[in-house]
Amino acid sequence: MELPWLDLPFTLLTLLLATRLAYDYYGVVAATFTGSFSLQIFLFYCFARWYRHTIAARAAADADGDGGGGAVADEEAAPPVLIPLLEGRGGGGGGAGAASSLANRCFAVVFMVFVPLVIVVFERSQADVVAYALCLANILVMVVWLSPDAAADPASAAKSFLRLSDDEDEGSCSGSGHGAAEDKCCVCLAGMREAQALRDLPRCGHRFHAKCIGKWLTAHPTCPVCRTTAVPPPAPLPASGDHADDAITPV
């Protein structure tokens, strides 16, 4: 069942209910604090939902235009830590489903905190039934209706977190000296192309942008990848005394 925005009114009602409880039983100060905190939660939740929806729509549009290549580019451009939490349902197949499920359950746990508050504070009347029903409806909307139909892949989140390490293991920042299109300059972390001014270190053969490695070598005498000495040591100064005088050509 796909009801992507139905959780927003339930979330707003739950937060308004918590603010009203604080006002009725603890006064204006508690209501002000609860209302401000509830507003922050709701705004952040709306932003997260909008971000996920935007990423999913953009990935779907790029996949239609580029035959699937655009989705991979968006996945590489997105921060690896945010992908498991904010990626949309249509942005990455099984990984996107796992991300959607993870995000929904995280928000559900947050709002489940209000359920004990309602049970403890409310008096025995019909109001507690209404409040408890609202909280349960919010949790059901977020956990059941918004969960993906397919089973979540438990390895997708870990794979997203380890994307940077995988890139380093595959040698994407090695600069092997062949000028491959996927090589990256380990100084500025940008891609390298043959049309750019590149420089190979003589001893190890690692390749970098000429400008980047020039600035690096002014402060460090070693290769930023393998730490091999790239700059020859300075020539020894002439010894003091007679040898220094002999080195001077007489006028």
UniProtKB/Swiss-Prot annotation:
Coiled-coil regions, chain positions:
none
On whether Transmembrane helix is a keyword of this UniProt record, the answer is: yes
Pfam families per record: zf-RING_2
Zinc finger, RING-type: residue spans?
185-227
Which Gene Ontology terms of cellular component type are present? Answer: membrane
- What transmembrane ranges does the database entry give? 28-48, 102-122, 127-147
Q: Which UniProt keywords apply?
A: Membrane, Metal-binding, Transferase, Transmembrane, Transmembrane helix, Ubl conjugation pathway, Zinc, Zinc-finger
- Provide the protein name: E3 ubiquitin-protein ligase Os06g0535400
Protein's membrane topology: Multi-pass membrane protein
User: What's its catalytic activity?
Assistant: S-ubiquitinyl-[E2 ubiquitin-conjugating enzyme]-L-cysteine + [acceptor protein]-L-lysine = [E2 ubiquitin-conjugating enzyme]-L-cysteine + N(6)-ubiquitinyl-[acceptor protein]-L-lysine
Keyword Metal-binding found:
yes
The record's subcellular locations are: Membrane
Q: Which organism is it from?
A: Oryza sativa subsp. japonica
- Predominant localisation class: membrane
Select a single GO molecular function from the record's annotations and give it: zinc ion binding
Q: What is this protein's function?
A: Possesses E3 ubiquitin-protein ligase in vitro.
Instruction: Please state the pathway this protein functions in, per its UniProt record.
Output: Protein modification; protein ubiquitination
* GO biological-process terms attached to the record: protein ubiquitination
Q: What is its EC number?
A: 2.3.2.27
What InterPro entries does UniProt report for this protein, alphabetically? Znf_RING, Znf_RING/FYVE/PHD
